[in-house]
Swiss-Prot record:
The lineage of its organism: Eukaryota, Fungi, Dikarya, Ascomycota, Pezizomycotina. Belongs to the calmodulin family. Calmodulin mediates the control of a large number of enzymes, ion channels and other proteins by Ca(2+). Among the enzymes to be stimulated by the calmodulin-Ca(2+) complex are a number of protein kinases and phosphatases. Residues 8-43, 44-79, 81-116, 117-149 form the EF-hand domain. This protein has four functional calcium-binding sites. PANTHER family: CALMODULIN LIKE 3, MYOSIN LIGHT CHAIN 1, 3. Ca(2+) 2 binds at residues 57, 59, 61, 63, 68. This is Calmodulin. Ca(2+) 3 binds at residues 94, 96, 98, 105. It comes from the Eukaryota. It comes from Emericella nidulans (strain FGSC A4 / ATCC 38163 / CBS 112.46 / NRRL 194 / M139). The gene is camA.
Length: 149
């Protein structure tokens, strides 16, 4: 998993890790983890931090070594990539860049990928995703739709 990180990322993570490894023993406490993550531009919630710690801290000794930290950061980066992919997909559908996917935009994209849909089918797709009932799909509704897949 950590193999997917670039040398630059590993170096950046090592630097951040070292800042919080006060005694230089190659371990950081779980309490310090949130501070390390935030220094790297991540913003995990308390429950996300606890989940990450539980996944990584196999011996439950309350500390995380650098290889464990790298594995965890690689996982976090992978999650971020999928968010970016969803954002890019939304832009493909939102042809006029107004922040919404209309029935016409949905029909156009579906037709361009070879999906021949009737107006009723397109309207049904919009209805399924359209949580606020405004007849179009906003970014948050699109994310919800994509996460269900």
């Amino acid at each position: 998993m950590a193999d997917s990180l670039t040398e630059e990322q590993v170096s950046e993570y090592k630097e951040a890790f070292s800042l919080f490894d006060k005694d230089g023993d190659g371990q950081i406490t779980t309490k310090e983890l949130g501070t390390v993550m935030r220094s790297l531009g991540q913003n995990p919630s308390e429950s996300e931090l606890q989940d990450m710690i539980n996944e990584v801290d196999a011996d439950n000794n309350g500390t995380i070594d650098f290889p464990e930290f790298l594995t965890m950061m690689a996982r976090k980066m992978k999650d971020t990539d999928s968010e970016e992919e969803i954002r890019e997909a939304f832009k493909v559908f939102d042809r006029d860049n107004n922040g919404f996917i209309s029935a016409a935009e949905l029909r156009h994209v579906m037709t361009s990928i070879g999906e021949k849909l009737t107006d009723d089918e397109v309207d049904e797709m919009i209805r399924e995703a359209d949580q606020d009932g405004d007849g179009r799909i906003d970014y948050n509704e699109f994310v919800q739709l994509m996460m269900q897949k």
